[in-house]
């Protein structure tokens, strides 16, 4: 593995670590928001109008960011039926992996391209409870798209180099 690939690997796994920390923070915020809503409703028969919307936004970001981590860790959904027909280590299996990563990178590009449109349109609409432009929440599509592309390209490079050198 040359210096450029080591640097790319450092960036990719650094971003993954940062995203994992952000997910932990979002999960904590979501739990506190839901818990405070439950306590206020149960004890005081009062409600925080913004808590469920905040929890929903946190959940959406968690889902999308978590899926990007899943791409890097290769834990995303695959067509297992195709892999069951191919012997382990066979060239067809490697081609299927590459094809899958190319599709994920393309999906990331689609997320970025059309996510920007959603963000622009969302900046003119305000969320009901939080009173912020919904475009901020729609940014999760663009961020996830960039992460999909980054992780898929990294894995493609690693798999291509690993295969050429005789190891995976």
What annotation goes with each model-predicted range?
Residues 1-168:
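Alpha-helical transmembrane segments and membrane-interface helix-loop junctions
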């Amino acid at each position: 593995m040359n210096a450029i690939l080591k640097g790319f690997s450092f960036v990719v796994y650094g971003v993954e670590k940062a995203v994992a920390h952000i997910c932990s923070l979002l999960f904590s915020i979501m739990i506190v928001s839901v818990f405070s809503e439950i306590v206020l409703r149960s004890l005081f028969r009062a409600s925080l109008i913004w808590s469920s919307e905040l929890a929903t936004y946190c959940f959406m970001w968690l889902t999308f960011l978590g899926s990007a981590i899943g791409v890097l860790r290769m834990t995303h959904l695959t067509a297992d039926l195709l892999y069951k027909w191919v012997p382990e280590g066979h060239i067809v299996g490697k081609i299927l992996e590459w094809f899958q990563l190319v599709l994920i990178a393309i999906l990331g590009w689609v997320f970025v391209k059309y996510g920007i449109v959603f963000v622009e349109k969302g900046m003119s609409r305000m969320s009901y409870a939080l009173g912020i432009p919904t475009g901020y929440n729609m940014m999760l599509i663009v961020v996830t798209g960039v992460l999909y592309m980054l992780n898929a390209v990294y894995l493609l490079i690693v798999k291509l180099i690993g295969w050429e050198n005789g190891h995976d």
